[in-house]
C-alpha cells in the first residue's frame, strides 16, 4: 500500500511541478529591466543581502520567532498526541486513523489557501486566522467531544497547521527580500525547533494528571503571546 501511495504521489505531483514552477522571469514572459531604469525601495529590499548580525538585530525577526513558535508548539503538540487523546475518549484505532487523515487533508488544502491569500491580504490577519482556528480546536478538545466533533476539530487543527509554512515564507520574503530568504529561514530554524519540547511537556502533564486537560489549557495559554507578538509585525 505504501508503494502504491508513493507511486501515485509522484505521478500526480511531478507533472504539476513541471507545469507550474518557473525559474526565471523570461519563462514567465517578464522582460528584464534595462540598466537605466530606476530601482524602487521594494526592489532594493529584494536584492539586499543581510548579514547574520543584521538579521538578528531586526525587530521583525524576533516578532516572527515569538509569533510562530507558540503556534507551532500548540498545534504540533496536539498533533503528536491526537491518537492517545482520542483513545482516552474511547475512539478505536481505525477511527483515530481517519482523524489523522482529516487533519492531513485539510492541512494540504489550507497550504494552498494561505499561499494564495498571502499574496493578496495582510499577513497579520491571516496569521490571526490560523491562530484562531488552533484556539477554537483546543477549546473544543477541552469539552471531551464526540467523534463527529473530533473530526471537525481535527480539520481545524489541520487548517491551522497548513498556514504555518506559507505564511512564514511570505512574511520572510516580503520583509527581508528573496536574496536573503535562505539565510533568514535558516536562522529561524533553531528557534522554531524549540517547539519539539511541546509534545514532551504534553506527555509529562498527562502522566502527572492522568488526562490532557491541563496540557490543553497550557497550549491555549501559549497562543496568547503569539497573538500579541504578531501585532508588532511591520506592514510589508
Region locations from a protein language model:
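Symmetry-related core transmembrane helices of the 12-TM Major Facilitator Superfamily/SLC fold
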Residues: 2-19, 216-232
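Flexible cytoplasmic inter-helical loops of multi-pass small-molecule transporters
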Residues: 22-49
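Helix-breaking motifs and short loop linkers at transmembrane-helix boundaries and internal kinks
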Residues: 122, 143-145
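Structural signature of the two symmetry-related core transmembrane helices
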Residues: 125-139
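Paired small-residue
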Residues: 148-156
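Intracellular juxtamembrane helix-capping segments at the cytosolic ends
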Residues: 163-176
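A late C-terminal transmembrane helix in Major Facilitator Superfamily
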Residues: 175-211
Amino acid at each position: 500500500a505504501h508503494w502504491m501511495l508513493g507511486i501515485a504521489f509522484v505521478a500526480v505531483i511531478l507533472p504539476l511541478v513541471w507545469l507550474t514552477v518557473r525559474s526565471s522571469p523570461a519563462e514567465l514572459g517578464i522582460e528584464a529591466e534595462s540598466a537605466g531604469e530606476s530601482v524602487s525601495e521594494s526592489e532594493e529590499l529584494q536584492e539586499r543581502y543581510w548579514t547574520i548580525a543584521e538579521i538578528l538585530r531586526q525587530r521583525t525577526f524576533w516578532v516572527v520567532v515569538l509569533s510562530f513558535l507558540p503556534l507551532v508548539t500548540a498545534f504540533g503538540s496536539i498533533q503528536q498526541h491526537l491518537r492517545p487523546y482520542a483513545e482516552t475518549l474511547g475512539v478505536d484505532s481505525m477511527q483515530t486513523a481517519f482523524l489523522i487523515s482529516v487533519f492531513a487533508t485539510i492541512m494540504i488544502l489550507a497550504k494552498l489557501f494561505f499561499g494564495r491569500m498571502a499574496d493578496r491580504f495582510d499577513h497579520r490577519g491571516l496569521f490571526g486566522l490560523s491562530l484562531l482556528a488552533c484556539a477554537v480546536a483546543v477549546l473544543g478538545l477541552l469539552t471531551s467531544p464526540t467523534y463527529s466533533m473530533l473530526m471537525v476539530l481535527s480539520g481545524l487543527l489541520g487548517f491551522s497547521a497548513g498556514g504555518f509554512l506559507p505564511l512564514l515564507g511570505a512574511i520572510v520574503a516580503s520583509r527581508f527580500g528573496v536574496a536573503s530568504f535562505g539565510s533568514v529561514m535558516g536562522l529561524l530554524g533553531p528557534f522554531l525547533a524549540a517547539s519539539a519540547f511541546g509534545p514532551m511537556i504534553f506527555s509529562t502533564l498527562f502522566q502527572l494528571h492522568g488526562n490532557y486537560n491541563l496540557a490543553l489549557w497550557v497550549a491555549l495559554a501559549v497562543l496568547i503571546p503569539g497573538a500579541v507578538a504578531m501585532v508588532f509585525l511591520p506592514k510589508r
